[in-house]
Amino acid sequence: MTKKIAVLTGAGISTSAGIPDFRGPDGVWTKHPDQMSVYDIDLFLRNKEDREYSWRWQKESPVWTAQPGTAHKALVKLEQAGMLTLLATQNFDALHEKAGNSDNVIVNLHGTIGTSHCMKCHQ
């Protein structure tokens, strides 16, 4: 009997790839609590500085150059073995895709940095 596995991943799986989390000791919001407002759409739209910071952060983010870690690669092996049926992730770094997991098992709960857009203007 083949066992089927569903996995939920969060920031911890990607910190080893050099992507900072948000709330940990070296997290983005821990170091820059004033920047939490970029995740409030109304504040984001009202404050030009928040928008500029957000776009600059996205452009310079380590997400673009990060490589999948050991845990990402292990999840690919589980899928290849026919065991992984669902991979839900809170991460927006697309490292599961980069590692080789297929789109039919991945659910990006918050989207990905490459597909993000404004919920109001859709840009």
Question: What kind of feature is each model-predicted range?
Answer:
Residues 1-123:
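Conserved catalytic core of sirtuin-type NAD+-dependent deacylases
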